Regions:
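A short beta-strand motif characteristic of beta-propeller blades
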Residues: 27-35, 70-77, 113-121, 162-170, ...
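Beta-rich, blade/repeat-based domains predominating
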Residues: 14-16, 35-49, 78-94, 100, ...
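A short loop-to-beta-strand structural motif that recurs across blades of beta-propeller domains
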Residues: 17-20, 61-64, 102-106, 152-155, ...
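Short loop/turn segments immediately following the C-termini of beta-strands
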Residues: 8-10, 57-58, 98-100, 143-145, ...
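Blade-level signature of beta-propeller repeat domains, shared across WD40, Kelch, NHL, RCC1
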Residues: 245-281
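An edge-strand/N-cap motif at the start of beta-rich repeat modules
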Residues: 1-30, 276, 280
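Short loop/turn segments that connect beta-strands within beta-propeller blades
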Residues: 23-27, 65-70, 108-112, 157-162, ...
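Residue position within the beta-strands of beta-propeller blades
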Residues: 4-6, 54-55, 96-97, 139-141, ...
């Protein structure tokens, strides 16, 4: 097993603009794939059989890679895609956040065919992370964009895209950057509040899946660098992981304890993190 991280580059990244691999102890293993179609990557998701890795590339395309890092599926260029996060839905389709269009689209797992809107364009001012529950309920983090546009909330939709709640949470100290669903069904959000402020408070926040009430807050001890938190992922060990500007942090989800920085790399500027089998696994 290995840890894979997308490192952002460009105007809003200043990272490495590639898909990086790390051993479970945090040792860098280099670039997972050197395919030139992977540029300034963002969202990541692993297929249910753990054989394919889906990657949202900054070249306006979606790719699927095998365990050797070879591209085995490619949508081709999708003009205007500007993909953010990506997640496989319970129905097997791959969901992608379109930042410019401010919506979520779906493509078939084989990456054939044109993307189909899951939600109307402009459904939120600036989409951040999202995730689907087992019943198809879709939770979409609505955050602040690079130009300061947006709002800080979570919108909820049923499996058909009908809005259930456009402001699911009431939290005056959150600015969502990614969203995940915990094993207990609650909603997890990485936050930097106020967004991009020099003195921003960074945290990971858990909300009750039924009421939207804040349950608890995860954060490392003071003095431990935790800047620009982004992608969230539950590992095979059940721990909660969050990739940030210079590291990947781990928390014991059962009791909330900070377990340490499992990856440390200056200018990582991580966007998404996943666990993916090695060829020898």
């Amino acid at each position: 097993m290995q840890i894979l991280v997308t490192s952002a580059s460009g105007a809003n990244g200043d990272g490495y603009g590639s898909l990086l691999s790390f051993s479970l102890d945090g040792t860098p293993r280099g670039t997972f794939s050197t395919d030139p179609r992977i540029t300034d990557p963002r969202g990541l998701s692993v297929s249910a059989d753990r054989r394919l890795l889906y990657v949202n590339s900054g070249s306006d395309r979606i790719l699927a890679l095998d365990a050797t890092g070879n591209v085995v599926r490619d949508t081709g260029e999708i003009p205007g895609l500007n993909a953010g996060g990506g997640n496989l839905a319970p129905n097997g389709r791959y969901l992608v956040g379109m930042r410019s269009a401010r919506t979520i689209v779906a493509v078939d797992a084989d990456l054939a065919g044109a993307p189909q809107n899951v939600l109307p364009a402009g459904i939120v001012p600036f989409p951040r992370g999202f995730a689907s529950a087992e019943d198809g309920t879709l939770y979409l983090a609505s955050g602040i964009g690079p130009e300061g546009e947006g709002e800080n909330s979570i919108a909820v939709f049923d499996a058909e895209g009908t809005p259930l709640a456009l402001r699911f949470i009431t939290d005056d100290a959150v600015s969502p950057l990614d969203l995940a669903i915990a094993p207990n069904g609650n909603i997890i959000v990485s936050s930097e509040f106020p967004f991009r402020a020099p003195d921003a408070v960074t945290s990971i926040r858990e909300y009750d899946r039924s009421t939207g009430s804040l349950v608890r807050v995860f954060a490392p001890p003071s003095g431990v660098g935790f800047h620009q938190p982004r992608g969230l992922r539950f590992g095979p060990d059940g721990h909660l992981y969050c990739v940030a500007r210079d590291n990947v942090m781990a928390f014991d989800f059962a009791d909330g304890r900070f377990l340490g920085s499992v990856v440390e790399m200056p200018r990582l500027n991580g966007q998404a993190v996943v666990f993916f089998p090695l060829r020898t696994d």
